[in-house]
């Protein structure tokens, strides 16, 4: 399957087009890791299947269950190959369990996979791969197995091993009649809360009696009357394997939430069930059970992790522990000398005996490192040489394979070695550091292991006590009858009981795994080197370059990195038959300037791993002195640096141009900085380097003369760095006006100037070099010169910035520098006709109306001392508008009409109008100073509830005197639906800011449309501000002046009719309440309710006020606030209380704060629980509104996705909010019918 990827021939050569870049090596999929020192296999977690893994390991380490399953052959269960045949009855679940158990027993891998088994369960979604309850899985899996084994000799497998019965009895105290009921069980469920342990729980369940007396009598069928009685339960039949499920998870009815019981709950390693059984005449050994598995849950009731403690009954695993430091090593009399124990010969023989007398050589070094805590090279290489050489020198003990990849002990020395090892094993392991495992007396102690998905670790029996309590505690217990004895041939024999076809399958799989591991090991130890042949290179421009092409100069060599440098040199000699003389191999690297040699490789006896050569390394093959007759300097000190050198261009006549040119140059890193002047033939000059400390890297710093002898590296220059060269005899913008050199100057950059003078020229755009200190006047003159325009433009032109949308901004004064004008390098400027405004003038944009389209603004230059009135006249004249009914407004930052410029005699400077501002010509004359022009709207709640019956439909008079706004998401009532508001425009009034609210109402009543409403007096009107085309703030005090309301100059007022006058206090909140109609998802018409928030402002206070208003018991109502923008109702409950940790005081929810933000005009839904017990407050209109919002959001999302696809712009992932807890789903296993 791997093709020729793992060829035995390590040295392969290919001519590769190396110039295209290094190849990306695809790493082959590695085979599963072998078993660890315990020699037991774990099970891989598929995401959340730790609950399944723990139960499967328990069943696997139940030998009677495992062997009973193995006893079912293909003639009963069917064949895997026939599972897709329609007529074949293939019992896929038992087959997959057999194969999984065989893999856990025999396959040499760290962890087995349950993917095939879960597929046979029908688990195709991610839901089953999340964590579930292992107790639930235990019952479901047993049920699925029973169904799968119907009609086979194993049909009673679960019944024989796990089935037990309980008998419940009630004994009449009068006639002694016994009424009994028998129950079957596969596991016993016992309580944990308020119980000290398992024996205590069993005593409560099967020993203590429940007595029926007094008010709780029992009706006896024999006596036919209520009598005293006693109820009890007993275990009638005990299964060979007893499963106990602990009720760790309970429900707190006070907090209304689940919780995990973490109190101490003990359980014995051996338990006598005789006191709890109905029959007690049997021998005591019949009732003795031994604990052999504990499934442990770590976490809470909504998540966590399972693992299992398991007793290895058959001693299949290797049960070893680290020796404790506190214990003495051994009796000194029994110890050999430390030097003898520390001899590598003894340690290597011990390792080989542990590894079944065969191990790859490279793994032998790793095992040695693990044993003694130090590598071979550091401890023994100096005295004994390389490890492979040491093995070769002791050929009378060690036998290397033909390719020297593996090593084993010779047969004639293995017996002697084994006796030596047995004599010295204790000393060796006692001398090892604590990390290495030691041997223990594993015969007398029970073998317990902690199996945590893929990981298997040995534990001591006393470690089980740690799982009595806490967040990580026992959840299921498995006991086996102590009389169950295992046959001697099953001890430490994983092949016992496994059918032949599975033995053959596992043997073949192990051979395939070994082959793959060998191939993978070979691939992992093979790397690619790029050989650069010296004769094919020449030294040019400071670095090495191919003479012809990379194809002829570079050879790709695949080589085994476990071989030595001498082997590599010999292989290259054989490949390069034309080579004559010495051959030196050096590490080279491709740098921006070319190829550079860093260091030569020495020590032919070293392996390539020890020389630290990396995969894909560039190796230069040469004589070590010269290339093409040029002596080559090597090392990092003389590494070539590719620098960008900037200097002023020189024209053909020797005149210095203003254009700065950039050219690459290569210099050795250890060369003096001053050599750059020699390279450019500049006799004297100043060198500027880019200052790293400047923000954005836009600053330059001059190198002092005393530092000119420092090297490029000492100056901090590296590949890609830029340096600026200034000739000392130049007099241009790179010098200050005093012609003195400065130690810091700003970076030179460019501006783009476009010809917008409507004059013909050869160039439409030029690039002008400048610094941030360059004057705008100089840039303008340079642009006119380079655009080859008339010199007369110098007196009648200006530069105007162009924004990203192509709009021309206000002209920049000539006297400004680029920094003062806030112009960034790379900006675009337009050369336009007309002078730039002087320092006393303003350049303004203006447009008519508030809906300004981009590009339609007009321009004007005025004196900053001009008045608003005169400025308005100039703008009206320039735009061709007639009349005096106009006023000016300044456009605000969000491109909307701002406050009007009311002080018409004030100057623009006094009103802080600046160049570039936009003024809007708005139709309508401003009211006199101190007066307001207020639009008046009519606010009519739709429907008949509590309003004037003589009102006409507002839409009837729309065409004659008004316009209607319908705010579909406003508060209010509309018959049976919450909240639809119509605002009807009545007209404008002019009123003094000192007038009262009552005077505003009176003046509004003089508007012609008011005559049709028949409002008796201003006291029968309620005033609201208009915000976003619907009622906003309630204006409550009639005698308060309008100025004190701070309404602003753009205020609009809507008036609502009342049946009678009202006097609302400052703490009163006006609410629209609507009672829900049961069963119809609609509401009755709204009624106004005034709630005094000064009495507490809490949910309880409002609930009481609503209950009093509707004459209902407070405990029989539910209320909720309506959010019309979201079409949502938020229930208001007096139980919403928070408890702070410090003071332990209840913190009331004040409804005028979060999350309710209750204010005037809000809609409150009221539910009468006496006749309506539905939890829902929403209406059909809410459903429709939410659906429309969802469709709009979906449309916006699709348009955004389409825009992103067009622009190929990938948005960075936003922070994901915490996901709500997913609903719990039931677990099931799908089984076919075999009846």
From Swiss-Prot:
Q: What does this protein do?
A: May be catalytically inactive.
Active-site residues are 50 (nucleophile), 305 (proton acceptor)
What's this protein's name?
Answer: Ubiquitin carboxyl-terminal hydrolase 40
Family recorded in the similarity comment: Belongs to the peptidase C19 family.
List UniProt keywords, sorted A-Z.
Hydrolase, Protease, Thiol protease, Ubl conjugation pathway
Residues in USP domain copies: 41-482
Q: What Pfam families would the database entry show?
A: UCH
Task: Name one molecular function that GO assigns to this entry.
Answer: cysteine-type deubiquitinase activity
Region labeled Disordered — which residues? 1180-1235
Q: What class of enzyme is it?
A: hydrolase
One record GO biological process? regulation of protein stability
List compositional bias (Basic and acidic residues) regions by residue number. Answer: 1180-1190
One cellular component term (GO) for this entry is:
nucleus
Q: What is its EC number?
A: 3.4.19.12
- Name the tissues where it is expressed: Broadly expressed.
**Species this protein is from:** Homo sapiens
Q: Show the ranges annotated as biased composition (Polar residues).
A: 1205-1215
Q: Which reaction does it catalyse?
A: Thiol-dependent hydrolysis of ester, thioester, amide, peptide and isopeptide bonds formed by the C-terminal Gly of ubiquitin (a 76-residue protein attached to proteins as an intracellular targeting signal)
């Amino acid at each position: 399957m791997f093709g020729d990827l793992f060829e035995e021939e390590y040295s392969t050569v290919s001519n590769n087009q190396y110039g295209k870049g290094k190849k990306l090596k695809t790493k082959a999929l590695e085979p599963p890791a072998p078993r660890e020192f315990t020699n037991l296999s774990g099970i891989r977690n598929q995401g959340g299947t730790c609950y399944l893994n723990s139960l499967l390991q328990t069943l696997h380490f139940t030998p009677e269950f495992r062997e009973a399953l193995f006893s079912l052959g293909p003639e009963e269960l069917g064949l895997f190959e026939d599972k897709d045949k329609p007529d074949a009855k293939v019992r896929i679940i038992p087959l997959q369990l057999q194969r999984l158990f065989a893999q856990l027993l025999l396959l040499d891998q760290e962890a087995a996979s349950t993917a095939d088994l879960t597929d046979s369960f029908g688990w195709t979604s991610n839901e089953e791969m999340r964590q579930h309850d292992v107790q639930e899985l235990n019952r479901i899996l047993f049920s699925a197995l029973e169904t799968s084994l119907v009609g086979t000799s194993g049909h009673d497998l679960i019944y024989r091993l796990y089935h037990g019965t309980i008998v419940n009895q009630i004994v009449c105290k009068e006639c002694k009649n016994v009424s009994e009921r028998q129950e079957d069980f596969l596991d016993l469920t016992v309580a944990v809360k308020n119980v000290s342990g398992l024996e205590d729980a069993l005593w409560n369940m099967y020993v203590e009696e429940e007595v029926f007396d007094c008010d709780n009598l029992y009706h006896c069928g024999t006596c036919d009357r209520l009598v005293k009685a006693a109820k009890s339960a007993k275990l009638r039949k005990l299964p060979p394997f007893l499963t106990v499920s602990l009720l760790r998870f309970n429900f707190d009815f006070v907090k209304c939430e689940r919780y995990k019981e973490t109190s101490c709950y003990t359980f014995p390693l051996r338990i006598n069930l005789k006191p709890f059984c109905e029959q007690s005449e049997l021998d005591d050994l019949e009732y003795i059970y031994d604990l052999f598995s504990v499934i442990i849950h770590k976490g809470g009731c909504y998540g966590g992790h399972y693992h299992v403690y398991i007793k290895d009954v058959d001693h299949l695993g290797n049960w070893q522990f680290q020796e404790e430091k506190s214990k003495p090593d051994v009796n000194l009399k029994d110890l050999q000398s430390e030097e003898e124990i520390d001899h590598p010969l003894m340690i290597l023989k011990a390792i080989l005996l542990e590894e079944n007398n065969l191990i790859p050589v490279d793994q032998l070094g790793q095992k040695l490192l693990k044993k003694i805590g130090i590598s071979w090279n550091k401890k023994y290489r100096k005295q004994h040489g390389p490890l492979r050489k040491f093995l070769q020198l002791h050929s009378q003990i060690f036998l290397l394979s033909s390719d020297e990849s593996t090593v084993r002990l010779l047969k004639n020395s293995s017996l002697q070695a084994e006796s030596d090892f047995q004599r010295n094993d204790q000393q060796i392991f006692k001398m090892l550091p604590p990390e290495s495992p030691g041997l223990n007396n594993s015969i007398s102690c029970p073998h317990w292991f902690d199996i945590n998905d893929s990981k298997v670790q040995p534990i001591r029996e006393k470690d089980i006590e740690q799982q009595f309590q806490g967040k990580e505690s026992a959840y299921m217990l498995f006991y086996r009858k102590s009389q169950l004895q295992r046959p001697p041939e099953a001890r430490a024999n994983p092949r016992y009981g496994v059918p032949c076809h599975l033995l053959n399958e596992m043997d073949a799989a192990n051979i395939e795994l070994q082959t793959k591991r060998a191939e993978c090991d070979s691939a992992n130890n093979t790397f690619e080197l790029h050989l650069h042949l010296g004769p094919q290179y020449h030294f040019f421009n400071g670095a090495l370059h191919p003479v012809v092409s990379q194809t002829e100069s570079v050879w790709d060599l695949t080589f085994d990195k476990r071989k030595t440098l001498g082997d590599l040199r010999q292989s290259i000699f054989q490949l390069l038959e034309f080579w004559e003389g010495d051959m030196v191999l050096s590490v080279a690297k491709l740098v921006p300037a070319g190829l550079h040699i860093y260091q030569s490789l020495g020590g032919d006896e070293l392996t390539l791993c020890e020389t630290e050569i990396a995969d894909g390394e560039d190796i230069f093959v040469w004589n070590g002195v010269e290339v093409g007759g040029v002596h080559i300097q090597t090392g990092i000190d003389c590494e070539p640096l590719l620098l960008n050198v900037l200097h002023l261009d020189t024209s053909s006549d020797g005149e210095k141009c203003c254009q700065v040119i950039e050219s690459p140059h290569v210099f050795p890193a250890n060369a003096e900085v001053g050599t750059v002047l020699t390279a450019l033939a500049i006799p004297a000059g100043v060198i500027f380097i880019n200052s790293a400390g400047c923000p954005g890297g836009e600053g330059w710093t001059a190198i002092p003369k005393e530092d000119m002898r420092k090297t490029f590296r000492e100056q901090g220059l590296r590949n890609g760095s830029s340096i600026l060269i200034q000739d000392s005899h130049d007099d241009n913008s790179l010098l200050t006006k005093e012609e003195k050199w400065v130690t810091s100057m700003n970076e030179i950059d460019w501006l783009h100037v476009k010809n917008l003078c409507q004059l013909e020229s050869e160039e439409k755009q030029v690039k002008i070099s400048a610094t941030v200190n360059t004057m705008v006047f100089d840039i303008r003159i340079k642009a006119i010169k380079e655009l080859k325009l008339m010199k007369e433009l110098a007196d009648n032109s200006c530069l105007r910035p162009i924004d990203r949308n192509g709009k021309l901004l206000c002209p920049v004064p000539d006297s400004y520098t680029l920094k003062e004008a806030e112009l960034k390098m790379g900006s675009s400027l337009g050369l336009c006709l007309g002078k730039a405004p002087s320092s006393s003038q303003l350049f303004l944009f203006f447009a008519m109306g508030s809906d300004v389209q981009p590009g339609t603004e007009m321009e004007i230059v005025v004196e900053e001392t001009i008045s608003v009135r005169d400025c308005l006249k100039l703008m009206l004249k320039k735009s061709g508008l007639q009349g005096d009914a106009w006023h000016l407004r300044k456009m605000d930052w969000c491109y909307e009409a701002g406050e009007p410029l009311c002080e018409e005699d004030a100057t623009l400077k006094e009103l802080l109008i600046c160049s570039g501002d936009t003024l809007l010509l708005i139709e309508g004359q401003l009211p006199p100073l101190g007066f307001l022009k207020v639009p008046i709207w009519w606010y009519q709640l739709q429907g008949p509830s509590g309003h004037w019956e003589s009102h006409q439909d507002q839409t009837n008079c729309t065409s004659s005197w008004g316009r209607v706004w319908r705010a579909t998401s406003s508060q209010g009532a509309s018959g049976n639906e919450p909240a639809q508001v119509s605002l009807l425009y009545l007209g404008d009034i002019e009123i003094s800011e000192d007038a009262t609210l009552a005077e505003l109402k009176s003046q509004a009543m003089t508007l012609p449309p008011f005559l049709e409403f028949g409002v008796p007096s201003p006291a029968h009107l309620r005033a609201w501000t208009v915000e976003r085309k619907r009622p906003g703030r309630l204006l409550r005090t009639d005698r308060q002046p309008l100025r004190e309301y701070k309404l602003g100059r753009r205020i609009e007022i809507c008036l609502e009719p009342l049946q009678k006058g009202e006097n609302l206090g400052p703490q009163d909140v006006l609410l629209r309440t609507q009672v829900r109609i049961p069963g119809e998802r609609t509401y009755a018409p709204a009624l106004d309710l005034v709630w005094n928030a000064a009495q507490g402002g809490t949910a309880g206070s409002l609930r009481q006020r609503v209950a009093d208003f509707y004459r209902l018991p407070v405990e029989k109502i539910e209320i909720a606030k309506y959010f019309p923008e979201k079409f949502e109702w938020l229930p208001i409950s007096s139980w919403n209380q928070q408890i702070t940790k410090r003071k332990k005081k209840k913190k009331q929810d004040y409804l005028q704060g979060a999350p309710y933000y209750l204010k005037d005009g809000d809609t409150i839904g009221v539910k009468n629980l006496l006749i309506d017990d539905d939890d829902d407050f929403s209406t059909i209109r809410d459903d429709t509104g939410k659906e429309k919002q969802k469709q709009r959001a979906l449309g916006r999302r699709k348009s955004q996705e389409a825009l992103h696809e067009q622009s190929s712009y990938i948005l960075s992932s936003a922070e994901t909010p915490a996901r709500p807890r997913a609903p719990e789903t039931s677990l099931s296993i799908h089984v076919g019918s075999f009846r």
